[in-house]
Amino acid sequence: MSDDHPYHVAITATAARDLQRLPEKIAAACVEFVFGPLLNNPHRLGKPLRNDLEGLHSARRGDYRVVYAIDDGHHRVEIIHIARRSASYRMNPCRPR
């Protein structure tokens, strides 16, 4: 774990694929956000999701959403999915842990 951030990041294969498909400027903004402010305080920057996506959080980056899970016990933020808002909540709620 880095001394600079209280949390470290894990990116799922789905989120990595999402990043590759994003426009370059959006992808760069998402990476900067994930490895910067999000790791400092993931509870503050996102909002908790409900219903089928309970246990996940979502943070805005323009028209895009970064969906992530927080593991406080291991000080880890797992990036699950990155997509336009209109598609970001249609994901399968079953996710690796």
From Swiss-Prot:
Principal EC category: hydrolase
Induction remark: Expressed in log phase cells (at protein level). Induced by rifampicin treatment. Expressed in human macrophages 110 hours after infection. Induced in the lungs of mice infected for 4 weeks. A member of the relBE operon.
Annotated GO MF terms: DNA binding; endonuclease activity
Keywords tagged on the record: DNA-binding, Hydrolase, Nuclease, Repressor, Toxin-antitoxin system, Transcription, Transcription regulation
Signal peptide limits: none
Domain of life according to the entry: Bacteria
EC number: 3.1.-.-
Effects seen without this gene: No visible phenotype in culture or upon infection of mice.
Entry similarity comment: Belongs to the RelE toxin family.
Protein name: Toxin RelE
Lineage: Bacteria, Bacillati, Actinomycetota, Actinomycetes, Mycobacteriales
This protein's encoding gene: relE
